[in-house]
A protein has these predicted regions:
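Active-site anion/phosphate-binding pocket segments in diverse small-molecule metabolic enzymes
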Residues: 2-11, 15, 64, 83-86, ...
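Active-site-proximal beta-alpha core segment in soluble small-molecule metabolic enzymes
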Residues: 5-9, 13-16, 23-194, 208
Length: 371
């Protein structure tokens, strides 16, 4: 029998979250971000489920975009990090990918090539993130350069990225919004504008513009500090489930796991769970990290190992070998788990390893003990 670790993924919840996002930004089109293997949920599976419901898909590399074309995805795809070398411009031209231009070298590559078809271009501004994008003071010149290029389809689109939208109290948010608005008011183009990520969708309706670019919210995790996914009416797409493979009666003072970090404070039942950091569970998880056994809240004890973790079964005295264990997802918000680690929900979702089986279903049902 194979390992029982499985990621149960809900199409219903994915589409529910998209509906919530559309209700928050009713005048905007949606670029669904499926980069990084759709935040760990499966690039192909997520994209095929979203294709009929969104306007574009967003990826980080041309390799991801080509995978989507290979499986028959026909809607526009945007390369959010642009191209990494000159020949990728030729591929983007042929395949009809939208390309983000954020670096002067990319414009030089463009000038030295003869693309088969005009490229749909997005100029990226660094409005305060300090990452990719042209500085605001120099961006008008690069915008004009793209506008005059015969290899670029007109009009030129413009985007930027909010650095602190998850924290509504941070003054940088309004500074970035003002900088972005100032730039687009100064150009005469008729292209589309995009500024908001998931957090921006919920926090800054005045900045929604033509396109919003939700990522983590699509997958049912909260993008906002201090607010749960449930408060935002988001539902987890992934429920990570496994099972108990051993139950031990431990005497008071018995150490558990590598480094003997945890010493049993009393005689207790401890369950061994078939999941570890080799599957994607965070090695930094502390004692007390919540885990559901038979839908009962229990606590992690001892250090996470590659293939196993241990759990205090005191709240679940009738647990037996084979009983289901939920590590995050349905009834156990991933943000709550992340709070006991040195990670955030993004890390946990995108870190699930390929030895975990993925099973898509319309309705999540974790009450059965079958895999």
């Amino acid at each position: 029998m194979s390992r029982t670790a499985v990621a149960i993924l809900s199409t219903e919840n994915l589409l529910h979250n998209l509906k919530v996002i559309k209700e928050k930004a009713p005048q905007s089109k949606v670029i669904a971000m499926v980069k990084a293997n759709a935040y760990g949920h499966g690039l192909r599976s997520v994209s095929s489920r979203l294709e009929r419901h969104v306007d574009m898909l967003g990826v980080a590399s041309i390799d991801e975009a080509l995978i989507l074309r290979k499986i028959g995805i026909q809607i526009p795809i945007i390369l959010a990090e642009g191209v990494f070398e000159p020949n990728e411009l030729l591929v983007a031209s042929t395949e009809g990918f939208h390309v983000v231009f954020h670096e002067e070298a990319q414009l030089q590559w463009l000038a030295n090539l003869s693309c088969p078809l005009p490229i749909q271009a997005w100029l990226k501004l660094d409005s305060g993130m300090g990452r990719l994008g042209f500085n605001i003071d120099k961006a008008p010149g690069f915008y004009d350069q793209l506008s005059k290029s015969p290899q670029i389809a007109q009009p030129i689109h413009v985007m930027s990225h909010l650095a602190c939208a998850d924290d509504p109290k941070n003054p940088l948010n309004q500074q970035q919004i003002d900088a972005f608005n100032g730039f687009i008011k100064g150009i005469s183009g008729k292209g589309a504008y995009s500024l908001c990520n998931s957090a921006g969708v919920f926090q800054y309706p005045v900045a929604h513009h033509h396109f919003v670019r939700p990522g983590i919210a699509l997958y049912g995790a909260s993008p906002i500090l201090g607010k749960s996914a449930a408060e935002l009416n988001l539902k987890p797409v992934m429920t990570l489930q496994t099972s108990l493979i051993s139950i031990k009666e431990m005497a008071k003072g018995t150490p558990i796991g590598y480094g003997a970090r945890y010493l049993c404070p009393e005689d207790m039942r401890v369950g061994i769970v078939a999941f570890g950091y080799g599957d994607g569970y965070p090695r930094t998880a502390r004692d007390g990290t919540p885990i559901l056994v038979n839908n009962t809240r229990c606590k992690l004890v001892g250090r996470v190992s590659m293939d196993m973790i241990a759990v205090d079964l005191s709240p679940c005295p009738h647990a037996k070998v084979g009983d289901p264990v939920i590590l995050w997802g349905n009834d156990l918000p991933i943000e709550e788990v992340a709070a006991f680690t040195e990670n955030v929900s993004y890390d946990l979702l995108s870190g699930v390893q390929n030895r975990v089986k993925f099973h898509w279903t319309r309705y999540i049902n974790t009450s059965t003990n079958g895999f």
